[in-house]
Amino acid sequence: MSNNIPAELKYVASHEWLRLEEDGTITVGITHHAQELLGDIVFVELPEVGANLAAEEQAGVVESVKAASDVYAPIAGEVVAVNEDLPSAPETANSDPYGAGWFFKLKPANVADYDSLLTAEQYAGEVD
């Protein structure tokens, strides 16, 4: 599997990645492929902590020199944290999309939803 699609994460076709954390929360960000398509990211709008999001509901916005794109909640849940550093350093979503460039954390409404998402191999098939 490519370094650009880490095998330990889950994915959705709208180019968000998810990581199940030890505390049961799910960290969400945009994929390497998404940041490549967008180009240099210049603005990020994140959801409010405490917001209850439905699966596939718009959770934020990312703007680049090329385009603006919505960021979606891959599964239903409550936003329990946002990456406070991202709005002042949106380029982090380009340079470290799977690390410091994460967007928000969800407390999933149903953690089993995580298991039904795309594997790295399946997501790679979506973007090839």
UniProtKB/Swiss-Prot annotation:
Keyword DNA repair tagged: no
Domain (Lipoyl-binding) ranges: 25-107
Pfam families linked to this entry: GCV_H (PF01597)
UniProt remark on cofactor binding: Binds 1 lipoyl cofactor covalently.
Biological process annotations from GO: glycine decarboxylation via glycine cleavage system
Record keywords: Lipoyl
Lineage top rank: taxon: Bacteria
PTM annotation (N6-lipoyllysine): residues: 66
Gene Ontology cellular component annotations, sorted alphabetically: cytosol; glycine cleavage complex
Cystine connections: none
Cofactor (UniProt): (R)-lipoate
Keyword Nucleotide-binding included in the entry's annotation: no
Subunit structure: The glycine cleavage system is composed of four proteins: P, T, L and H.
NCBIfam families tied to this protein: gcvH (TIGR00527), PRK01202.1 (NF002270)
Chain's role: The glycine cleavage system catalyzes the degradation of glycine. The H protein shuttles the methylamine group of glycine from the P protein to the T protein.
Family: Belongs to the GcvH family.
Protein name (database record): Glycine cleavage system H protein
